[in-house]
Amino acid sequence: MKKYILIGLGGAIGAILRCFIRNTKIPVYKGEFPISTLMINLSGAFILAVILITANEIWSFNEEIRLGIATGFVGAYTTFSTMCKETIILMNKNLYFLAFCYVTVSVVFGLLFAYFGALSARKILSRLLKVRKEDEKAS
């Protein structure tokens, strides 16, 4: 039961944050490209990789907490269905090349952001563990 509560809480926070970012206007951008959804999904790929690397390889997160963050927060924060809807909207406006670019950039850069999220987590956390070991030796 606890894991469902944590997933729900994480989901509520992720959905609220996504809505906030989605409704934030980027003053220098006025085009058709759905930049806010792209930013949300790319940052979500990065965040999910960091969380999973941290939970699985560095610290042993409680499974319920990991699910609350990964499934709840990141699952509600990112939005594949909105990306699909926005792609269809671009296609309905005969903006086929822009739709193609949107899907391509979303997938390719999503994978890159996930890769760099995993890389960043490993690098930062290995440094933290090294500092912790040095502190323990010094004491």
UniProtKB/Swiss-Prot annotation:
InterPro entries: FluC. Na(+) is not transported, but it plays an essential structural role and its presence is essential for fluoride channel function. It is found in: Cell membrane. The keyword Ribonucleoprotein does not apply. Fluoride-specific ion channel. Important for reducing fluoride concentration in the cell, thus reducing its toxicity. PANTHER family: FLUORIDE EXPORT PROTEIN 1-RELATED (PTHR28259:SF1). This is Fluoride-specific ion channel FluC 1. The gene is fluC1.
